[in-house]
Amino acid sequence: FRAVMMKLLGLLYSAIVDADTTALMTHGHQEGVAKGYVPKRRHRGPSYAPLFSSEGRTGISLGAELRAGNVHSSTGAWDFLKLILSKLPSTIATSRIRTRLDGAFYNKELINCFEKEGFGYVIVARMTDPLKRTMYSARYHEFARGWEAASFTYTPFHWNKEYRFVAVRRPQKFEPEEVQRHLFTFKHYTYHRAMVTNLELTPEAVW
């Protein structure tokens, strides 16, 4: 089965590598369990926090690593991802491999590893007040009815250089109140997320 999956991957011109952590609740005293970092499950009981990876378009599993519930997603993430990336077919050039990660993986060390090895990445940014201010003042353009995107450079605290960020927003009038409660607003706009990336794509394509 594994050989079949790798053969299917070999047919791809490019690859999107997704990775995420989930919580597996346990009962009893199994080895390696601990209260975890996954926000929705934190403090509910002992768990594992396995790290999974799959190809973003085909859904093909690329690998997994079973970890204790109190291990943060970004801890050891590069070692895991480096192994995953090394297993991709050699027919897919490094320049055509992109990695997508959520905010739990947002840190300078991991991003520097991607840049050093030449892999593309899109990582959801952790929202800080300085980033929000930069995001609010960026120049946005409409790419779909009610949707606007912007690209801007920003230097996070202690990161020592500028990185490219992409943000997406909608006028509040287009956004249901239920959605607005889970996002943040500024001057009649609801902001969905900001992402740091090294991809040379339009903001809407990154999003």
What are these regions (language model features)?
Residues 37-92, 193:
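Electropositive, glycine- and tryptophan-enriched low-complexity nucleic-acid-binding patches
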Residues 13-24, 59, 97-106, 121, ...:
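Short, conserved catalytic/metal-binding motifs centered on acidic residues
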Residues 24-26, 60, 70-73, 104-109, ...:
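Flexible loop/turn segments at secondary-structure boundaries
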Residues 27-33, 38, 62-66, 108-114, ...:
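Short acidic, glycine/serine/threonine-rich loops at helix termini
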Residues 1-52:
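Active-site-proximal, Lys/Arg-enriched surface segment
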Residues 19-21, 52, 63-66, 101, ...:
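Glycine-rich, histidine-containing beta strand-loop boundary motifs that form or position
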Residues 120-207:
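An anionic, glycine-rich sequence signature occurring as long contiguous blocks
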Residues 71-130:
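Domain-level cores of phosphate- or acyl-group-handling catalytic modules
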